[in-house]
Regions:
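A domain-start/cap signature at the N-terminus of enzymes
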Residues: 23-69, 190, 221-225, 235, ...
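Short substrate-entry loop that stabilizes the transition state in hydrolases
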Residues: 62-67, 76-116, 182-183
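The conserved beta1-alpha1 loop
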Residues: 73-75, 208
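Alpha/beta-hydrolase active-site loop
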Residues: 119-140
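Primarily recognizes the serine-hydrolase "nucleophile elbow" in alpha/beta-hydrolase
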Residues: 145-198
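Short, proline-enriched alpha-helix->beta-strand connector loops that line the catalytic pocket
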Residues: 198-204
Length: 268
């Protein structure tokens, strides 16, 4: 049997065709998510928000009801303009949600900048998130009394921050290994007492790892102290003593966590 060697130029061309063909492309994750985009007029008003965002659980045309909405804020590894990053972060939540028999919309936005590098102007911004939520309620069948917020690491900070300024948006929140300042884990917001008063109004479970060297669990203790000072009795601090910065994987992998979260409705 004879062996034929392709000339390098031909081989390179063949590989390029393969890479750009439907056969050679890496298929989109089979996670049921769709990528949607803010209208340009709204996107132009944002500070540090990718106009694209991930949506899961959108019902078929003709659906007349309302669904709960789970908002997931990614960590620092999700920052940028590659919407696949937050998509991959939120993917592991889908299985436990199914096991908990919870039908919900899930939206995962993307922050485009680092708050530390951009001196507080990057990362999660209240104005951006307010604009996004208003758009979601306008365009998706969202039950505004069943909006839930969670996030990991930088997204845990975003959860504290957004709910700390806008508690009326949410039925319950669950920050994971979240800092409490805009410039990183060692920073503390100047509005800690305000956050405490506002977070005291919400059911909250905040999760940390006892061995976390990135965001130490004492950040959670500080926010709990502020909530307690305001008379709050709905918040819990849960520390997994043997876990590090990956502590959020524990509740995110438990159907019982989602059953707790979705058991709440917004108080009017």
């Amino acid at each position: 049997m004879q062996t034929y060697l392709l000339p390098m130029k031909v081989l390179a061309f063949a590989l390029m065709v393969l890479a750009t063909s439907s056969f050679g492309q890496r298929s989109a994750p089979n996670d049921g998510m769709k990528i949607q985009r803010l209208p340009e007029a709204k996107a132009n008003k944002t500070i540090s928000l990718n106009p694209e965002y991930c949506v899961h659980g959108e019902p078929k045309a003709g659906f007349k009801g309302k669904l709960p909405l789970l908002l997931y804020l990614h960590g620092a590894g999700g920052v940028g303009l590659d919407i696949g990053k937050p998509r991959r972060q939120v993917g592991p939540l889908l299985g436990p949600l199914r096991k908990a028999s919870i039908e919900t919309l899930i939206v995962a936005p993307q922050a485009t900048g680092s708050p530390k590098r951009e001196k507080g102007k990057g990362g999660w911004q209240v104005a951006d998130l307010d604009l996004l939520l208003a758009h979601l309620i306008e365009t998706l069948p969202v039950d505004p009394d069943r909006v839930y917020l969670t996030g990991n690491s930088m997204g845990g900070y975003g959860t504290f921050m957004w709910a700390g300024y806008r508690p009326g948006h949410f039925a319950a929140i669950a920050p994971m290994v979240g800092g409490i300042g805009p410039l990183g884990p060692k920073d503390v917001t100047k509005d800690l007492d305000l956050w405490g008063r506002n977070l005291a109004k919400l059911p909250m479970r905040a999760y940390y790892g006892g061995k976390d060297r990135v965001v130490p669990a004492d950040r959670g203790a500080m926010i709990m102290k502020a909530i307690g000072k305001a008379g709050g009795k709905k918040a819990e601090l849960i520390v997994f003593e043997d876990k590090g910065h990956d502590a959020g994987r524990v509740p995110y992998g438990q159907p019982e966590f989602f059953k707790w979260l979705f058991s709440h409705k917004r108080k009017k």
